[in-house]
Design a protein with these regions (language model features):
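Acidic catalytic loop of the alpha/beta-hydrolase fold
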Residues: 348-353
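Alpha/beta-hydrolase active-site loop
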Residues: 140-165
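Short alpha-helix in the alpha/beta-hydrolase fold that links the catalytic acid
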Residues: 340, 354-364
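Catalytic active-site module of serine/aspartate enzymes centered on a nucleophile-bearing elbow/loop
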Residues: 370-406
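Cleavable N-terminal signal peptides of Sec/SRP-targeted secreted and luminal proteins
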Residues: 2-19
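Short beta-strand/loop motif that positions the catalytic acidic residue
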Residues: 338, 344-346
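Alpha/beta-hydrolase-fold enzymes
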Residues: 19, 164-169, 180-326
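Short, surface-exposed "cap/lid" segments of acyl-processing enzymes
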Residues: 44, 59, 64-135
Length: 406
């Protein structure tokens, strides 16, 4: 499968009429080094002077997951009782929360604000690509999961581990994109986990998707049926793995000051929305060193199903639904069972998370939806919550102020 680095060429062809203005961003406050692209998450955190721990947990169905912890800030030695768990989006990893540097990475910012920061990794990404009995390279059974299993099994397993280690009974949860989807799955099918959440913050929330505007995602959704059949026939189960080949392509196309770097930027824009003023081109080599982190084909197909159905429901197995669910169609997630306080942060220019879908989500969450906040930048896109130059100002400050209420 092609990564966003290769999709860049296609994205350029279909989106060349909307190219962003060329910017060198030499005065960008986000500081990065190209060597960061090759460092592991613990190596990155250590390099910038923060404490770090790496934990492994095993799920009930045998997946071995990695969690990274920043127990306190750079200038502190005290571990706080304020625990926060960060969950990444599709094709991502715990690296998302730190690769923009100490002044812009949410993981670092929260640690310096006095939080005990834990960053999860879902099954199938390169940090959680392990199992007690299955080999991801040879056993297709390893990849038979979507974001349903991530929300139903992975996230509660990681949260239980975090609470056990810290001795706390509840924590804050912050998710981006799929990290919000998996939270809604967890708290709707395991309502007992609502009591373990002080508050949840959805950055670019995704549940309902029938109004999303990403042209490439619409193309994928339209062809999802034939593509799914083809993937099964030729044995493709893993989507956009993180490996040496992908890293090499990223080095070639996305290097800082490289003439092809604009292809990478426009690939991201074509999927998530155009936001040239927020894109720090200097972090692209680091970003493409850590992303894509890998996922299952079924994770992507589950989102394609959401786009086509307009519903927020479990994975559609087609004719096998009757055996799986006892009905011809998958059951919807019962959002009315979610009681944890939820704050939704969304933006005009997010092609993946449409405003009308976020409003519908808030309505269906009922009293659990404490508030929804429109980002005060009309160009803010789906990835800017993580990598945008003004993400701390527009998003993180709001989240931290809201956390203080709970």
């Amino acid at each position: 499968m092609l990564s966003i680095k290769l999709v860049a060429i296609f994205a350029f062809l279909v989106c060349s009429s909307a190219l962003p203005h060329e910017r060198t961003l030499q005065n960008n406050p986000v500081l990065t080094a190209d060597e960061d692209a090759d460092l592991t998450v613990p190596e990155l955190i250590t390099k910038y002077g923060y404490p770090v721990e790496e934990h492994q947990v095993t799920t009930s169905d045998g997946y071995i997951l990695t969690i990274h912890r920043i127990p306190h800030g750079k200038d502190s030695t005290t571990v706080s009782d304020k625990v926060v768990f960060l969950q990444h989006g599709l094709l991502s990893s715990s690296a998302d929360w730190i690769i923009t540097g100490t002044t812009h990475g949410l993981g670092y910012i929260l640690a310096d604000e006095g939080y005990d920061v834990w960053m999860g990794n879902a099954r199938g990404n390169h940090m959680s690509r392990n199992h007690t009995t299955l080999d991801p390279d040879n056993d297709s059974e390893f990849w038979q999961f979507s974001w349903h299993e991530i929300g139903a099994i992975d996230v509660p397993t990681m949260i239980d581990h975090v609470l056990e280690v810290t001795g706390q009974t509840s924590l804050y949860h912050i998710g981006h994109s799929q990290g919000t989807t998996s939270f809604y799955v967890m708290t709707s099918i395991h309502p007992e986990y609502n009591a373990k959440i002080k508050a949840h913050f959805s950055l670019a929330p995704i549940a309902y998707m029938n109004h999303m505007t990403s042209p490439l995602m619409h193309i994928l959704a339209f062809w999802s049926g034939p593509l799914d059949v083809l993937a099964k026939l030729i044995g493709i189960n893993e989507f956009l793995p993180n490996n040496e080949f992908m890293a090499m392509v990223g080095d070639v196309l996305c290097a800082d000051d490289d003439i092809t770097q604009f292809l990478c930027t426009n690939a991201l824009f074509a999927i998530c929305g155009f936001s040239p003023d927020e894109m720090n081109a200097t972090i692209l080599p680091v970003l493409t060193g850590h992303t894509p982190a890998g996922s299952s084909v079924n994770q992507v197909m589950h989102y394609a199903q959401e786009i086509n159905s307009g519903a927020f429901r479990q994975f559609d197995y087609g004719l096998a639904n009757l055996d799986k669910y006892g009905s011809l169609t998958p059951p919807p997630y019962q959002l009315d069972l979610i009681t944890a306080p939820i704050y939704l942060l969304y933006s005009h220019n997010d092609w993946m998370s449409a405003e009308v879908d976020v409003v519908k989500l808030c309505e269906n969450l009922g009293d659990a939806c404490q508030a929804k906040f429109l980002i005060a930048d009309g160009e803010f896109n789906h990835l800017d919550y993580l990598f945008g130059i003004r993400a701390p100002e527009l998003v993180y400050n709001k989240v931290i102020s809201l956390m203080a209420r709970h």
